[in-house]
């Protein structure tokens, strides 16, 4: 399939590459050959920070120049400048109250041979552990007839994440580790809940492996999960905080 000339996408990638080079990020990638040179696939990614979409594109672009169409919340598309960039890069807007259009657009993109990036946790996990996943990645793969590729990122949350202000100098020289797992085949006959639960187990196992080989000790650090000696919230505390935040938003919207 001949690739389109997409100047906005290429410009955005160039800016990202320049920024990550300026920060002197130390990238380690395993399993990148699992990302096909052509054909559709769902990239199901961990979500511990706000820059994983750009970081994963950084890794895939360096490998084979594949462009990823990310599912992003409608609120981002509603912003004047950001929204224009997202549309220009052909990302997919998701209305959390009515996601049918996004699902249809994603299936169409996958069938056309695109890579579609999704965060099945449906939000940043501030415990820095993989929380319960939504079934969207499995459903998309089954309907479009493409595989799911699990993608784990560790270290990217040290650049920008939820509930923690990262200092300017803290971003320099941060190691960022990536793992691209073996493609998972999903058929319409499969139980998508079971596939999704297995995907969660796989992603957490991949994160565990990245943490074991991470070149910086994180004991006592805000970015390390509590079970490894860090000071991040426990999964239960993170869920409770998210629920309270949602209650406040709902109350303000009334």
Residue ranges and their predicted role:
Residues 104-112, 174-209:
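A charged, well-structured terminal subsegment
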Residues 37-98:
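Catalytic core of membrane glycerolipid acyltransferases/transacylases, capturing the structured
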Residues 29-30, 92-95, 186:
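Short acidic-hydrophobic, aromatic-tinged amphipathic segments that line or gate anion-handling sites
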Residues 109-138:
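Catalytic-site beta-strand/loop segments enriched in glycine and acidic/polar residues
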Residues 9, 16-47:
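Helix-to-loop junction immediately C-terminal to a conserved catalytic motif
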Residues 128-194, 220-226, 233-234:
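A cross-family acyltransferase "interaction/gating" segment
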Residues 85, 108, 139-143:
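Hydrophobic/aromatic ligand-binding patch that stacks against planar heteroaromatic rings
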Residues 222-254:
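Acidic, Ser/Thr-rich low-complexity intrinsically disordered segments
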């Amino acid at each position: 399939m001949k690739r389109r000339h997409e100047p906005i996408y290429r410009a955005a990638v160039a800016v990202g590459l320049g920024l990550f080079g300026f920060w002197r990020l130390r990238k380690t990638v395993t399993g990148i050959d699992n990302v096909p040179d052509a054909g559709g696939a769902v990239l199901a990614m961990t979500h511990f920070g706000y820059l994983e979409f750009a970081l994963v594109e950084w890794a895939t672009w360096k490998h084979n120049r594949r462009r990823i169409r990310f599912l992003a919340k409608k609120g981002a598309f509603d912003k004047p400048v950001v929204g224009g960039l997202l549309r220009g890069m052909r990302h997919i807007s998701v209305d959390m109250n009515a996601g049918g259009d996004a699902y249809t657009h994603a299936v169409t993109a996958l069938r056309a041979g695109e890579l579609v990036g999704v965060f099945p946790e449906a939000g940043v996990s501030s415990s820095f552990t993989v929380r319960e996943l939504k079934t969207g990645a499995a459903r998309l793969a089954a309907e479009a007839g493409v595989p799911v590729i699990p993608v784990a990122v560790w270290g990217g949350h040290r650049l920008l994440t939820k509930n923690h202000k990262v200092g300017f100098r803290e971003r320099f020289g941060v190691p960022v580790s990536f793992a691209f797992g073996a493609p998972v085949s999903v058929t319409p006959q499969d139980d998508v809940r079971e596939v999704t639960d297995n995907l969660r187990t796989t992603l957490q196992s991949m994160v565990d492996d990245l943490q074991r080989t991470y070149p910086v000790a994180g004991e006592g650090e805000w970015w390390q999960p509590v079970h490894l000696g860090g000071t991040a919230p426990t999964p239960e505390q993170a869920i409770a905080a998210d629920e309270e935040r949602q209650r406040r938003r709902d109350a303000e919207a009334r």
